C-alpha cells in the first residue's frame, strides 16, 4: 500500500511515462526515483500476512494459503482481526448426501453434489454430481457440470464447464507451476480439454483442446 502526495505522484508518473527505458513499475521505477531525488519517505513495518498478487499464479497461491492458516499466517476466523466483506444475500451452502468436501472453503449459495478438495468456492457455485474440483479457485455463480474435472486453475464469475470437460492440470512436482485461467461468462463445451497454460477469454466448443 502506498500513500502519496497527489501533486508529487503526478509529477513522477508523467516523468516515468516519458522515459522509454522505464518498466512503469512503482517498485522498480517510481520509488527509486523518489529516493534518487531525496524525497521524504516513511515506511511502516508490518508483521502480518501480506502477499503481492500481481500475477495469476500468485493470486491462486494466495487463495490456497487461506486454506492453511497455520503455515501461511492468514486466518479468516481470527476474532481479533476480522475481515469484513460483502454479503451476497444468498442462502447457506448445500452439501449433497454423496458429495465429498475436503479442506476447502465453500461460501454462501453454493450447491455441492460432487467432489471438492483443497479449493476456494465463491458465492453461488454449483458442482454437480460426478464433477471434481481440486486445488482450484472458483468465483461466483460458476457451474461445473457432471463428469467435469477442474484442477489447479482459476475460474472467474459465471463460467459454465460442461459435462466431461477437463480444465487445468496439477503439476507433478507439487510446485505452483502454470495456472489455467478462464475469464468471466465463458462456456467450456462438453469433452473439451484445457491445458495448464491456457488463458481463455472466449467460449470453447465441444471437444476442442487448448494448451
Identify the function of each model-found stretch.
Residues 7-8, 15-211:
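Left-handed beta-helix
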